[in-house]
Regions:
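Acidic-histidine catalytic/liganding microenvironments
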Residues: 56-57
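Charged, solvent-exposed interaction patches on well-folded alpha/beta domains
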Residues: 1-7, 11-14, 31-40, 48-51, ...
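Extended, alpha-helix-rich binding/interface surfaces that flank or overlap catalytic cores
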Residues: 18
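Membrane-proximal juxtamembrane linkers immediately C-terminal to transmembrane helices
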Residues: 9-12, 22-26
Length: 201
């Protein structure tokens, strides 16, 4: 009977459920967790899995729950994903502000952002949906005579955007705004008002 109970509970993982990830794929998280061969639930404590995940530079936190009776594992991730690549520093800036040498296929900041604006700039980027961030090809600090906190964005779809720090969260509505102009190409001014100057066809 004792041997039967041990054998019953020492079974392999059947299902792994992952949530909270946008940058990392499910398979990458499974590989980082060292669960790719769906090992025994008994030999892989929740704490051990969490520790493996938190060692990864792109993961800031992880919650792991197991249902050993149904051989299921639930993993919830908080990502430390890349925000942009700094052309000046030649480094990638992560969500937590850390700079790493690795080059990512992400938005490139092409010039220096003044230190007095930098922290707020990072905080604003953290609040933009990662799917919108991935639509930005380049960002340039571009003040004029009137507005100091002004930026120019080159979008992957060919549009240009002028925006100020206080309007940055408007970027989360970017797709809806562009759609309202029948997906035509042009310059979107979010630095003063909200209007769209369509390119000559």
């Amino acid at each position: 009977m004792i041997l039967f109970i041990i054998k019953l509970f020492n079974t392999n993982i059947i299902n792994i459920y992952i949530s909270g990830n946008e940058y990392l794929t499910d398979q990458q998280i499974i590989d980082i967790s060292k669960l790719s061969d769906y090992p025994s639930t008994i030999n892989n404590l929740s704490f051990s899995i969490k520790k493996r995940l938190q060692k990864n530079i792109y993961i800031s936190d992880a919650k792991v729950k197991k249902n050993i009776f149904l051989n299921k594992i639930y993993i919830k991730i908080e990502e430390n994903y890349p925000l942009f690549y700094s052309q000046d520093d030649k480094k990638t800036i992560l969500y937590n502000g850390e700079k790493i040498e690795k080059t990512e296929n992400i938005m490139v900041v092409t010039n220096i952002i003044p230190q007095k604006l930098y922290d707020e700039f990072l905080n604003k980027l953290r609040k933009i949906d990662i799917n919108i961030l991935n639509r930005i090809s380049e960002l340039k600090y571009s003040p004029n005579e009137v507005i100091e906190e002004r930026f120019f964005l080159l979008m992957n779809d060919g549009n240009y955007v002028y925006i100020t720090l206080d309007k940055f969260l408007t970027l989360n509505k970017y797709l809806d705004i562009v759609k309202s102009f029948n997906n035509k190409k042009g310059i979107l001014y979010l630095d003063s008002g909200e209007y769209f100057d369509i390119f000559d066809e």
